[in-house]
Structures are given as C-alpha cells and as structure tokens.
UniProtKB/Swiss-Prot annotation:
GO terms for cellular component: extracellular region. Its main location: secreted. Hemocyanins are copper-containing oxygen carriers occurring freely dissolved in the hemolymph of many mollusks and arthropods. Signal peptide: none annotated. This is Hemocyanin F chain. Belongs to the tyrosinase family. Hemocyanin subfamily. Cu cation 1 binds at residues 172, 176, 203. Hemolymph. PROSITE patterns: HEMOCYANIN_1 (PS00209), HEMOCYANIN_2 (PS00210), TYROSINASE_2 (PS00498). Tarantula hemocyanin is a 24-chain polymer with seven different chains identified. Disulfide bonds join 534-582.
Length: 629
C-alpha cells in the first residue's frame, strides 16, 4: 500500500466530527481493546491540560500505536470515532499517526480544517451557514469574510492579528501532539530527546515574539502574571464549539483564580511554585525515591521543564505538582470554578485556542521567569565558550528590496470549512494575516585556519529599544531575541560568503497541506521532513515592525560544528526542517548547545562591544510595515 493510499484512508477519520451523532456505535460491538475508553462524554470540550482527559487520551493513543498493522489501526480508529469524545479522538489519532512507523509520510490534516469553529469567530460561522442555505447548487462558491472580535476600545485588540493567527494557533496544537505530556518512552519505545527543554524554549520564544509585536504596535511589554490573587483582565473569544453547542466562555474583567473542587486549589499552585523556586536556589530537586538530582548546566533545564509542565518525565509530580497544566485549567474555568452554571471553559483549556487570550502570554512569561531563575544560577558564558578560533564574520547584510530593510504587510488567505462542518459544498472564509517579503542573508566570513571548517550558523533578531524609546541593555535585550534560523555551513580556507533564504528557516514550516491537497496526494511523501507541520508559521517569521520602520538588531554567530552536532543526526532525519522548536523525529536534538545559546544565560557585558567576539556580527536592520500589498 502506498503512502497516498494510506493518506486517503486516514482523511475520512477527521471529516465532519462536529456533526457526529452521540454514541453512534453499540459498545457491545466494539473491539475489546476499546472497552475502557469513552469515559469523557461526547460534546465536552477536551483539554490536554486536564489530567483526567489526558489519561483517557493516553490510553487511546497507546492502543492505536500498538495496533498490529495499518489495517488494524484504521479498524480501531474507525470504531473509536463513534465511541470517544470528538476532541479526544482527534488528539489521540493524531499522536498515533505521527509516531507509528507504518504511517511514515502520512500527514495529519490541518486542525483548522478539522475544527474550523476553534479558529473562526461564531459570527462568521453563522454567516457561512446562512450563505450555504441560500445557494442553489453545491457547485456554487461560498466565500465569507472573517468578522473582527474586538475594537479600538480594547488596546489589546491591536494584537489580534498575532493572537488569532490561524497558523500560530495550529502550531501550538501541533507541537503538543508531537510532544504529549504523557509520553512514556517505556511504552512507546521511542525517547523524546530534551523534551523538557523544548517545552521551555518553544514557549519562551513565543513570548519573545509576542513582546516584539507589542512594541511594534505601540504597546508596552506584557506584565507577567505573578500573583495567584491578582484580578485578571477581561477577554471574549467570540468562538462557539459546534460539538457542544455552547460558547467558549468569556472572562469578565476583575475575576481572580479560585479553587477547583474536583481538580486543584490555589494554595496548591502557590505551594508548587515555592517548592520549584526553593529547589532552584539549592541546586537540586528531590525525586520520587527521595534522591537529590542536581540541576546542572547540561540536564537541569530538561529536568525543570518536565517538572513545570508537568509531564510523565517529572521526577516527582507528587511534590512539585502540575503548575503549568493546572494554571491553564484554572484560568479556563475562572468564570465557573465549581461548574454550577454548566458553562464551557474558556480558550485557555485548549492548545488550539489558548494563544487567542492575552493571559496566555502573561502566564507563560510567569512560567518562563521560573526557568530564568534557574538560568541565573548558571555561570555566564566566558569568551572561550563563545569564540570560534580562526573564524571571523567580516560583514552581514539582509538582501531585500532595500538593503537591511524587511517589509511586512497584511495578506489575504482563505480557509476551507466544509471538511469540518457539513455544508452543501465548499465554503471558504477569507481572512488576513501578517506576512513579509522574502529576504536573503549574506554573511561574509574569513577562515584563517588554513583548513576547511564546519560551522553552525545561528541567527537571531531583537528590538533595540523599549516602549519608551530607551536603548535596551544587552542582558535585558536577550529575552527579546527571537531565533530566525540555525544551519550548517562549510567554510573553505580564506574568504567565504554564506547565503541563506528566509524561507529555509529552521524555525518555520513552509506550507501545511490542505484536505484537498492531501486527497490529491500532494504533500504526501515518505521522506517529508517537517515534523510534521509542527513549525512556527513562515508568515510570522519576523515581527510586524512600524510604518516608519522599527529598529532591530540581527545577530549572527558561527560556532564550531564539530563541537555542536550530535552524531546520530545525519541531516536527513524524517521531520527535521523546523528543528529549532520541534526537534527531529526519532532522533536526538541535533545541537549540543543550550537552546537559545548564547542568549539563554545572564550576560554581564553592558555593551555589544564587550560581549562580541570575532565570530559574531550585530547588524542594524529595520522592519517596515506596509499595511497591505
């Protein structure tokens, strides 16, 4: 059976899940392996942050993963579709597809087409339903424009283009099926290398990107969530779940976290935070056996990431709790903590919707601040840690329409809704998203060693000024630096010019195949390399910038590839294009250095001149927003 044949059998599993009738299959007819699943009622909003939901989802994806053959997998999935909760089904089947060897090359269809109601405002969905009813024929095209979810009375609405970006929200959902918190290597027979560190780094970068765009729109940097008793800002998502028929709950301004009787108390959250911070201060954590595990420079961040999330790899979840996941659930249920009003939770309960809420970023900056407490215990990098002897960056230029000027603009795209919602025919939603003109890095390098050298090229971008126009100090600026690319380059003796297109970024996914493309066999390949559509959307590679041009610094650093690379990574690993945030499938993370190096630790140098070594370059660039093109 070809990959294309497998893909065509997979796709119907994901279609029209919002229209399923309740309890379609008689449980007595189901496969005996599925007898224990189906506990979460259909129509309930599934949350991979909720431990009970996650427990059942894990049972299902492990059953599907262990299916004897591809035919057996399809058989089980088809039955499970009629038994289990809709969101739980998609989560578990997606995890299984990404990790089964006989599904290599098969692509999970885009979550925004499976559940368009998680991405498209309820007003727009309603408009689409009315337009569909009016059309005379299924061949007649229906195109509706997306509705705005706020106005200028709310300053945060300036960031709606970022928070509500379909690609960004899909990325967050996809990352969490690539790295399920309950992943058990002893059961799944595959190790997720540096999973805890990836949890830290992906979310840290998301916060840095969000702050860069806040500065681009004239807003101040976000204020981290820091107090479990603080009153939260209001938020209304304008989303309605079609599987439950209820809205994703709004959050009135002024509410604060309250105990969830059936889940977690506010005091638990405060206690877990204090235990984590204390362990960071003393330099070790206590595992389930009472042993002291050091938070060293090499593995400490990975250990801490597992504790904070908390994942199956947590060394002691009884003591350190479940801070990150529980926070998501508490904020999602802040309006109805004891369930007396039988309301849906808010968008913070779901990985495909939580980026829409401003509190997501404030909460993750709170989480990141705990990671930064650990990073502050590590020694600052010395010159010897940063240098690449005999290699000097002579010049670096961003080649675009104008040198060192990157243009951004709002671009129109469409989303097909008819695979997720039952319509007479195709129904598309037109929406706008940020995009940028393509550009190329040109890096002039001199290799004076007399030998061929192999280098890791690391490219970051960071703003130069704060919201008041003051110059950012380097140690303050480092938390704003966003990774743009990381790749291998060969340096001949003498002068070299390294060129690299922005579209080749190790951070981004270039294109996510649509349902229709997958049905035609496009984007289906056993050698596909994007793990697997997990990367940050390419159109959001750089911040928005300003109309007059916003000042940024492009940082380029070359390090010794022989010291950096991990031997098991041969550059051809399946699903490795967006490796910076997503890792490489069934392989070790291909860079020995800390994620975010060299900006992951405190920088004592007050100026660029004091920090810079010959293998570094700081280039002034502008990002200019052109509104529409």
């Amino acid at each position: 059976m070809t990959v294309q044949d497998k893909q065509r059998q997979i796709l119907p599993l994901f279609e029209h899940l919002t229209s399923l009738t309740r309890g379609g299959l008689d449980r007595t007819e189901s496969d005996v392996r599925l007898r224990r699943v189906g506990r979460l009622p259909r129509g309930t909003l599934f949350s991979c942050f909720h431990s009970e939901h996650l427990k059942e989802a894990t049972e299902l994806y492990q059953i599907l993963y262990k299916a004897d053959s591809f035919a057996d997998f399809i058989h089980l999935a088809q039955q499970a579709r009629d038994i289990v909760n809709e969101g739980l089904f998609v989560y578990s089947v997606s995890v299984a597809i990404l990790h089964r060897d006989d599904c290599r090359g098969v692509t999970v269809p885009p979550i925004q087409e499976i559940f368009p109601d998680r991405f498209v405002p309820a007003e727009t969905v309603n408009q689409a339903v009315k337009a569909d009813l009016k059309r005379q024929s299924s061949d007649e095209d229906v195109l509706v424009e997306i509705q705005e979810t706020g106005n200028i009375l709310d300053p945060e609405h300036k960031l709606a283009y970022f928070r509500e970006d379909i690609g960004a929200n899909a990325h967050h959902w996809h990352w969490h099926i690539v790295y399920p918190p309950t992943w058990d290597a002893s059961v799944m027979s595959k190790v997720k290398d540096r999973k805890g560190e990836l949890f830290y780094y992906m979310h840290q970068q998301m916060c840095a990107r969000y702050d860069c765009d806040r500065l681009s729109t004239g807003l101040r940097r976000m204020i981290p969530f820091h107090n479990f008793d603080e009153k939260l800002e209001g938020y209304s998502p304008h989303l309605t779940s079609l599987v439950s028929g209820l809205n994703y709950a709004s959050r009135p301004a002024g509410l604060h976290l309250r105990d969830l009787v059936d889940f977690v108390d506010v005091q638990d959250m405060a206690r877990w935070r204090e235990r984590l911070l204390y362990s960071i201060d003393i330099g070790h954590v206590i595992d389930h056996e009472g042993q002291e595990i050091p938070l060293d420079a090499e593995h400490g961040i990975d250990v801490l990431g597992a504790l904070l999330e908390s994942s199956h790899d947590s060394l002691n979840d009884d003591y350190y709790g479940n801070l990150h996941n529980s926070g998501h659930v508490m904020m999602a249920r802040i309006h109805d903590p004891d369930g007396r009003f039988r309301e849906n939770p808010g968008v913070m309960s779901d990985t495909s919707t939580s980026l829409r809420d401003p509190i997501f970023y404030r909460y993750h900056r709170f989480i990141d601040n705990i990671f930064q407490e650990y990073k502050a215990t590590l020694p600052c990098y010395e010159k010897k840690d940063l240098e690449f002897s005999g290699v000097e960056i002579v010049n670096c230029t961003v080649n675009a329409k104008a040198p060192n000027v990157i243009n951004t603009y709002m671009k129109e795209s469409t989303l097909e809704m008819s695979h997720g919602i039952s319509f007479k025919g195709a129904v598309k939603v037109k929406y706008q998203h940020l995009d940028h003109d393509p550009f190329t890095y040109s890096i002039s390098v001199e290799n004076t060693t007399g030998d061929v050298k192999h280098a890791t090229v690391r490219i970051f971008l960071g703003p130069t000024q704060d919201e008041l126009g003051n110059r950012l100090r380097l140690n303050e600026q480092r938390r704003f630096y966003i990774e743009l690319d990381k790749f291998h380059a060969e340096l001949a003796a003498g002068k070299n010019t390294i060129t690299r297109k922005s579209s080749e970024s190790s951070v981004t996914v270039s294109h996510t195949p649509t349902f229709e493309e997958l049905q035609r066999g496009e984007g289906v390949d056993e050698n596909t390399t994007e793990f697997c559509s997990c990367g940050w959307p390419e159109h959001l590679l750089v911040p928005r910038g300003t109309y007059k041009g916003m000042d940024f610094q492009l940082f380029v650093m070359l390090t010794d590839y022989e010291d950096d690379h991990v031997g098991s990574h041969n550059g051809q690993t399946l699903c490795a294009d967006a490796v910076s945030y997503c890792g490489a499938k069934d392989s070790k993370y291909p860079d020995k250095r800390a994620m975010g190096f060299p900006f992951d630790r405190v920088i004592k140098a007050r100026t660029v001149a004091d920090f810079r070594t010959t293998n570094m370059s700081f280039t002034d660039v502008k990002i200019q927003f052109k509104d529409q093109v």
